[in-house]
Swiss-Prot record:
Active site (record annotation): C104, C200
InterPro entries given in the database record: MnmA-like, MnmA-like_C, MnmA-like_central, MnmA-like_central_sf, Rossmann-like_a/b/a_fold
Residue ranges of the region described as Interaction with tRNA: 150-152, 306-307
GO terms under cellular component: cytoplasm
Pfam family of the protein (one): tRNA_Me_trans_C
Organism, scientific name: Clostridium tetani (strain Massachusetts / E88)
Protein name: tRNA-specific 2-thiouridylase MnmA 1
Site label Interaction with tRNA, positions: H129, Q339
């Protein structure tokens, strides 16, 4: 009789509680588990990134040793720089506000990392994301996590069917407190470790500094202007501003002023009243759908314009070149180019795209 081989899974280890419990849960379920940590940025002492890398690697290896599973380190610095860090900087330079986690999930965690895992003979990769992956009617679908406060499906809309069939996310069945309780129960020292909230490759959370130090193009100061083009003052470079911003403008106009537009061609930041940042129509590009390959007709659904935003009712309409028009029932505050708009029907993640342009119906 031929003995059935265990399914092999490579878990992306960050040194945090979610990925650590993911590895534990899968080992308990009988998988052959390997812990793998990605090195995605070189690290500098002055901004804290070198210390962060060292902490991630040390913590991840300690957890793997504790769980008695192999630990592997993989260098993805070149891929990360090309697919995440460089586009991140370019977006800011061109007046957009990017979400690097979306780029990273698309190109690194669920592409380059998946390929490395397959090279190791893995059947699956697993991460500590809070989301539910379910097979249904011949498709692999993504549903919101049990813990709606930790749900991370917004970041996963770019995943393709060939990737999803190799991905496990066991944390989706639990809330955060349950995950911490499991970690504590099995004796993991990191059970109370604080969740990371900053951009992973910018530990000091100063994206302006990061771009100035790493971009080949010199960041120029420019003019704050009103809607008619009248100069109101000087700004410190468009990379430092985003739509809807009020604080940190460094300009006094005698009344509240908000960033209502950024014009990279003129190196201008347009200031205006708060009402000007409310719009209800956007065009999204690079759209991906998960339950089906292509949107063929208008559909009413729930749309989110940023990770922390509440979903709002909208209609989406297919356009040419993998784009959609999104029309919200109500005007939304600070729809921002470069961010993602993500679509749901109830708890099912339908897909999403990158916000390319914004307009208003009135």
């Amino acid at each position: 009789m031929v003995k059935k081989m265990k399914k092999k899974v490579v878990v992306g280890m960050s040194g945090g509680v979610d990925s650590s419990v993911t590895a534990y849960l899968l080992k308990e379920q009988g998988y052959d588990v390997i812990g793998m940590t990605m090195k995605v940025f070189p690290g500098n002492y002055h901004d804290g990134s070198k210390e962060k890398i060292e902490d991630i690697m040390k913590s991840a290896k300690e957890v793997c040793d504790f769980l008695e599973i192999p630990f592997v380190e993989v260098d993805l610095i070149e891929e990360f720089n090309k697919k995440v860090a460089t586009p991140f900087m370019q977006d800011y330079i061109e007046g957009r506000t990017p979400n690097p986690c979306v780029y990273c999930n698309k190109h690194i965690k669920f592409d380059a990392f998946l390929n490395k895992a397959i090279e190791l003979g893995a059947d699956y990769i697993a991460t500590g994301h809070y989301a539910n992956i379910i097979e249904k009617d011949g498709r692999t679908l993504i549903y919101r996590a049990e813990d709606e406060n930790k749900d991370q499906t917004y970041m996963l809309y770019n995943l393709k069917q060939h990737q999803l069939k190799h991905i496990l996310m066991p944390c989706g069945d639990y809330n955060k407190e349950q995950i911490r309780e499991i970690a504590k129960k099995i004796g993991l020292k990191i059970h109370n470790k604080k969740d990371s909230e900053e951009i992973c490759f910018i530990p000091d959370d100063d994206h302006g500094r990061y771009i100035r130090e790493n971009c080949k193009k010199k960041i120029q100061e420019g003019n704050f202007v009103d809607e008619k083009g009248k100069v109101l003052g000087r700004h410190k470079g468009i990379i430092n501003y985003t739509i809807g911003q009020r604080k940190g403008l460094g300009i006094a106009l005698g009344k509240p002023a908000y960033v209502i537009d950024i014009i990279p061609e003129k190196n201008q930041v347009v200031l205006g009243e708060e009402e000007k940042i409310f719009n209800n129509i956007l065009i999204a590009k690079d759209v991906n759908f998960i339950p089906f390959d292509e949107l063929k007709e208008k559909i009413k659904l729930e749309a989110k314009i940023r990770y922390s935003a509440k979903g709002e009712i909208a209609e989406i309409e297919p356009l040419e070149n993998n784009r959609v028009k999104v029309t919200f029932d109500k005007k939304q505050r600070a729809i921002t180019k470069g961010q993602s708009v993500v679509f749901y029907i109830e708890n099912l993640l339908l897909g999403g795209g990158i916000i390319e342009s914004v307009e208003s119906s009135t």
